[in-house]
Structure formats: structure tokens, C-alpha cells
Amino acid sequence: MNEKYAALKSNVSMLGRLLGNTIQDAHGDVILEKVETIRKLSKSARAGNKADRDSLVEEIKNLPNEQLTPVARAFNQFLNLTNMAEQYHTISRHCEEHVCEPDVLQSLFSKLNQNDISKLDAAQAVRDLNIELVLTAHPTEITRRTMINKLVKINECLSKLELSDLSHKERAKTERRLEQLIAQGWHSDVIRQQRPTPLDEAKWGFAVVENSLWEAVPDFLREMDGRLKGYLGEGLPIDARPVHFSSWMGGDRDGNPFVTHTITKEVLRLSRWKAADLYLGDVNELITELSMTKCNDAVRELAGDEHEAYRAILKSLRTLLNNTLEVLDAKLHDAEVPKKETLQNIDQLWTPLYACYQSLHECGMGVIADGSLLDTLRRLKAFGVHLVRLDVRQESTRHSDVLSELTRYLGIGDYDQWSEQDKVAFLTNELSSKRPLLPRDWEPSEQVKEVLDTCKVVAAQPREAFGAYVISMARTASDVLAVHLLLQECGCPYRMDVCPLFETLDDLNNSEAVMKQLMSIDLYRGFIQNHQMVMIGYSDSAKDAGVMSAGWAQYDAMDKLVKACEEEGIELTLFHGRGGTVGRGGAPAHAALLSQPPKSLKGGLRVTEQGEMIRFKLGLPDVAVNSFNLYASAILEANLLPPPEPKQEWRDLMEVLSEVSCEAYRNVVRGEEKFVPYFRQATPELELGKLPLGSRPAKRNPNGGVESLRAIPWIFSWSQNRLVLPAWLGAGEAIQYSVDQGHQALLEEMCREWPFFSTRLGMLEMVYSKCNMEIAKYYDQRLVDEELLPLGELLREQLQKDIKAVLNVENNENLMQSDPWGLESIRLRNIYVEPLNMLQAELLYRTRKCETPPAELEEALMVTIAGIAAGMRNTG
């Protein structure tokens, strides 16, 4: 590996050596030697040695069944350890400047100065900063919580070993601890034995808050406060809340029959329980710290005659939090609920704690106030009483089914058969009616009752418990009005953000018309109180039309929505449903935000952070602080130095690129009759269904083809065999078509001057670097029927042409020239991913030959799936 990355290289080889010791202890020399042979052959084969590639294939074909699991596990574990070493490297003191972006805020302030942005405008933009990260469980984090906890501890050991003044004894002790952790990981299950329930997923989300975000939020705000004081002369207001969190875990019922209203209610209780538990930890720490006796009158009044006034106040808060835990425990376990005062709103903690904070400052103890107490006050604003706010997500047809069943019962026709105009008229009429719509004696079907019960759960909770009610597959104005009506009928006393999610290509293109229609309804304007949230779907649009076409539809929809809302004087928050992979809208955060349409971040940023990306971006406190800094600086830059409006000729060419790429994509995915059988044979798509990943089924409709597959398994399957087809198909072909039409110079100009376009091509380069045509070809040779082989050949040829087309327009000779660290990171893992790919192809070959494959083969296959996901740094 490049000498630039010496510290990382050294950590990777140390972890590899310790893993080798563990394998030797557990399985003796035979397995270790096999692993070493495969690793060396793979490295040599990657460098182009044909003889060693043939030897590698033979070596893997000749492995007996009982050796497959330990060999696969060795590479799987090594990739997890490599990921950990790399993640640690980005926050370590040895980190190179071009890797760590040492201070994104500092470089932003320099840019603002160069562009003569006034301090007044900058201060206002900071006050308006609103980053809401929405934690979602799908695509599910493939690494088990057990393993993640061990990886966090490994990170702590690496941090210790970095200290140069560590004594020989301390170093040996830390290395021994590392070896123990690696051994614990080796002897634990890599794969979950059962699918997680929605409750398990929610607990995983709370664990991320407890282990990382709880510490990261005050750290980030402290750092930002210091930066702002240096640049603006004023810090962050004490009640600033630039970053906060919502969650879909336990609220997302779209296509997940296991998320019921009962589950949602339980997750809300668990969320409050965890918040009270974490605040209790803070309060206990403050009791030990705030032993001072000098205080102002306000604190004296709160504390009464107690000598240690601060402690007296804190002890009363401790009682309140203990009561809250006791009451919630009783509710969670269906026990008798004690009648005690509990924490209902944040002011119960904020008011007394803020009084203590002011008193300490007034009494000359500001340095104490600005320690743990300030951290707790910052947390109160970020996490509230509920820790994370819960989104409810439901598919649009589930709401129209309720109204259809109801109107038939009332004898006024079938809502589903009405025109859109009639639906809107009916809904607006009912929304303004004073009489209830739901008859008392009506007994709805089970499915309809479930939707209404969910709305009742929303109505029974305070507004702060929820983020938004998201309507997936939203297509029309009536889809949005229907949810407002159902919430109203179920007694919801407050305005809920009802957020349409536009997912397919057609729905994105139609989103402006739908929102304009809604905004033209006076009653609706009253409901939304001049604030509208709209969610842009990335995964389904890419699956529907390919990445190039979907990317342009998303940009164009956002641009039109921003302008439409601005004309109407409505504040718009765009909610981005990005995935972890490019085929689902994933991109490096900073670049992705700066490539959005002008003014699209004025209403703040709301974005989903998906399963495995939560761990990579938010899993350690220091890494999370880096992520917050990237988000904050990108939003401030986008709002203070907005990108130029794209030229009309750029837009026109994007329309052409979009059309050509969509056609090229659909010609293969929908038009090629052999495509679905090829997909099923060349990837582990069918086997993926057995993996106990998330709580939701892999298909919306178990009998359908590609269109019924969820976006996640669709992409996951292709990233396993290294063709990564959905993340590039159609894009390069469209670019080459435009070059052939004489648009080379215009494409080069777009590349230089338009962040949207250059980011698209940068994402394609990253995908191309992760593809491996040799591996994809090997899967075909081992697994695919002869009559389907020409299709695989055709796709690989197309990929080669596409890479040339993109490099030509960028005037680059090699992929990822401008991101050497990203390329190095992919290379580092490739040496270990490729043996797993070869093993997986062999395992698929063996399991598909058996009616009932032996358990050891199935286990080994699951291990390769998890390992390749870790190596590709994404699931789907």
C-alpha cells in the first residue's frame, strides 16, 4: 500500500497478525496455511498473474465442505477489522491531510471571506442551521450488534496504541486485549440466527445514540461554538439545536407487516425510557460534580434551605427520572402503573438546569457551568424527552383502502373508483365538516382497523414524539389530503407534518403539479401553516429508470418544488431518502449536498441514514462529529454561496442524457427476456432471501419479477457478484451517445462548471472502481446456463465502453484520479474481497446442486455474503 498511509498499513497488518494467531489457536496450522495461500494467490492474481489466478480457482474448488466456513470467516473478519482500522485512521493523529479534511469549517470561513460574505449573514445562516438525521433500519446493518460492540472496543485499543509514550508493559497489555477482542469475535456468530424484530431494530438505533451520538452532539457543538467565536466573535446560543434525530425503526410499516400500531406504541415507550435512563446518568454525574454552595437567588428559591443548593435541585431531578423509569417499566411489562410524577416535557429538566447554569456564571464559576452541565443542556435540546422522534411511514393505497371501505359502508359509492377531482372535493369537504365521518357502529376489516389504530396512536402522543407521517408511493393530491383527514378523524389535536414521498420517475416528474394543486386549496394552506415537507425517493426511482435518469428527475423535481413553494411563500423542507449505495442515491455527503439545486437547503436538511451507513458515519463519537461538521459546512456553503443556476443548454442536454440512459437501462432490465433468469443465476438473489437481515420481507409481492423486488436486495445482489449493474447501467451509454452527437465540448464544460454533473460522474467512477469484470465473469462460468452467457458478456463489454466514455469526458486517464484516498481504500479491501467472491461462487455452485444443502454450506454462504458487504462498504 502507498507509503502515505503507513500508520493505517501498520494497524491493518497488526490486526491481521492477531487474527492469524486466533485462527491458529482455534483451527491449527491447516486452516491458517489455506487462508494464507489463498490470500497470496489472490494478491498475485489481482496484479495480473494468470497462472496464480488458475491456481486460486483450483485451490477453492478443492476445498472440502468442512473447511469452507472457517476460510470464509477468516476473510470476513479481516474485512471487518480493516474497515475498523480505516475508520479509526480518519480520526487518528496520524491521519493525512487529504484523508481527514482536517477542518471543513475553517476552509468554509476562508471561502466566505474570499467572497465577501458579511458576518451578519453568516451568523444568521448558523442560527438557521437545521440538520435532521433520520435513522433507518433498512437496508439492514449486516454486522450484528454483538460484533459492532467488539469493534468499538478495538477502536479504543488502537487509540491507546497510538500514544508514543506508552510503556512496554502498557503496550503489551493493550495488544493482549486486542487479541482477546479479536478472539471473542472469531468465536461468536458472524450472522444473526434469527431475523431481528422491529423492536430489535429500534434497540439497535438506541444503542447508536447511547454509544456514539450522546457524546458526539455536545462535542460537535463545543467545537463549533469555539470556531464561531473565532470567526464571528459570537458562539452558538445555548439553546441552539443545529442537529437532531428521528427514526423509522418501529414506525416504518411500508411493506413490513410486523410493524403494527402496538409495536409503534411500544417503541415510543422504549424511546422515552432510554432517554430518561441517559439523562439519569448525566444527573448522577452532575450530583458528584456540583458540590458548590454559592448560588444566586433563583437557585436558592428552587433549593429551599439546603446547604448544597445545586445538589438539592439535581436530587429532585434524579427522583423525577427514577419515577419516570419505574412508570415506563410498568407500562412496558403490563404491570400495575404507580401514580408518580413523571417527565412529560423537556422544560421539567431545562428550567432547573438552566437556572443552575446561570447561577454558576453569575457566581464566578462559568468554567464549571460550561463543562458537563452545558453538555446536558445541549443534549436536552437535541434529544428531547423522546431521544429520537419517530416517523410513521405507510403506503398510499393503505389510506385509500380505508376510505374505499368506509364510503361503501356509508352507501355513497366506492372511493377507489372516483376520479381524482371527486376525491379531492370529498376530502376537502370532510376536512372542513364539523361532524365526525367515522360511524360508531362500523366494524372495519383487520387491515383498515390497523391503519386507523396507527392514527389513534399518533393522536394520543404529544407532537414532540413524532417527526413526520410519510406517505410512500404518493402520486396525487388526494393521497396527502386522505392522511390529514384520517388523522383528524382519529382525534389528532395538532398539525402533523404529512410528507408525500415521490419515488418513481413518473411521480418525481409529476411532483410539482401535485404540490401546486395542494397549495391552491385554502383549507390545506391552513393545515400546513406555511410549512411543507416533501420526500424525494432515490432507491425506487433508480431501480425504475437507472441512476442517470433518476438523478436528473430528482434534481429537476427539487428545483421545481423549491421555486413553486417560494412563489407561494411556503417554507419547504426536502427530505432525502438516500441509500448507502449509488444505485440508491448514496454519495459522499459534502459533494451530494453541494450538487443540489440552488436554495434547496434553505429549509434545512432532512436525510435518511441507512443501516450500515449509520455505523460508518455515526458509529464512533469522533467519526460522528466529523460527519456533523461535513453536513454543517456543506449546508452553510450551499446557503451562503449557492451554486449557479444551470444554463439552459446544460438542462437540455441532461434531458437527452436522461431519456437515452432510461431507454438503455429499461431495454436490458425490462426488454431483455433472458435478463431475469440471468439475474437469478448470476447473483445470490434467491439465497439472500434466507439471510436473517432486516425485519421486512425482501419482496413486496413474492411472485413478481424484478419490479416487485425491494430496491435493497436488487442492489445488494449485484454488488455481491461485482457487476454492480444498477449503479451504472445506461449512464455511460448516454454519455457516449451525446459525444457521438457532437456534444463533447458541452459535456466537458458541464463537468468543470456544474457541481451536479461532476458529482454524478464522480459517483460513477467510484462504482466502476468497485466493479470487477473478472470476478463477474467467474460467477457466470461457474453458475450460469450456457444460453445465458452471451448476455453477461454483453453487459461486461458495455461496462468497459462506459468507463472509457466517462474518463474521456472528464479528460482523465484513470478512475478516481481526484480521490486517491478513496481508491486506496477500495484497493486495500479488494485483496480480501476477491477470495470471498471466489468462495461464494463455489458455494452457490455446490448449494444449487443439492435439494437440501448441508447446513455447513449454507452457513459458509451467509458468511461470504456478510463479508463481501463489509468489503464493498455497502449492502444495498
From Swiss-Prot:
Show the Pfam families listed in the entry. Answer: PEPcase
Q: Which cofactor does it need?
A: Mg(2+)
Q: Which reaction does it catalyse?
A: oxaloacetate + phosphate = phosphoenolpyruvate + hydrogencarbonate
The EC number of this protein is 4.1.1.31
Give the UniProt entry's GO cellular component terms. Answer: cytosol
Instruction: Please give the Gene3D superfamilies that the UniProt record associates with this protein.
Output: Phosphoenolpyruvate/pyruvate domain
Name of this chain's protein: Phosphoenolpyruvate carboxylase
Organism the protein comes from: Vibrio atlanticus (strain LGP32) (Vibrio splendidus (strain Mel32))
